Amino acid sequence: MKIAILGATSQIAQDLMLSFSNHKDYDLFLFGRNLGLLNNWIGRQSLDGSYHAQDYSYFNKSQRYDVIINFVGIGDPIKAQKMGSDIFKITEQYDDMALEYLKQHKETKYIFLSSGAVYGGSYQKPVNENTVATVDINNLKSTDW
């Protein structure tokens, strides 16, 4: 199965990639804004040769993916707060890229996840492998998604 992961430098993307690393029938194509950071992470996890780390310019309609998983976001709540509504300009660019792909490949599945949706919006620092999910399901805030 060919899986494109957008926002591959995010903690939740990396957690998923580690869990996928035992599945040899998954062919992962990782896209990130910071390829150096992404390639360093791949090396630290001893996953060299297993994953295809690429710049977003390589994401195009001629590639065939069974699934696109979108983790694109800011990842740092302080940066996100400073950006205000401008954060949507960043995420919109990658959402549009994925949606254009889906128009041409209707069979491709699309999943979007954010740190806020996974961990809740009350975190004060970027998430890491020790972050615990705390979503108050009965009192959701805009930062929870």
Describe the predicted segments one by one.
Residues 27-29:
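Short beta-strand element of Class I
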Residues 31-35:
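N-terminal Rossmann-fold cofactor-binding loop
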Residues 50-92:
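NAD(P)H-binding glycine-rich loop region in Rossmannoid oxidoreductase-like domains
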Residues 37-48:
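Short, conserved SAM-binding/catalytic segment
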Residues 3-23:
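N-terminal Rossmann NAD(P)H-binding glycine-rich loop of SDR-like oxidoreductase domains
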Residues 41, 78-86, 121-125:
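Conserved catalytic-core motifs of eukaryotic protein kinase domains, centered on the activation segment
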Residues 2, 66-67, 109:
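Structural motif
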Residues 96-140:
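Conserved Rossmann-fold NAD(P)-dependent oxidoreductase catalytic core, especially the SDR/UDP-sugar
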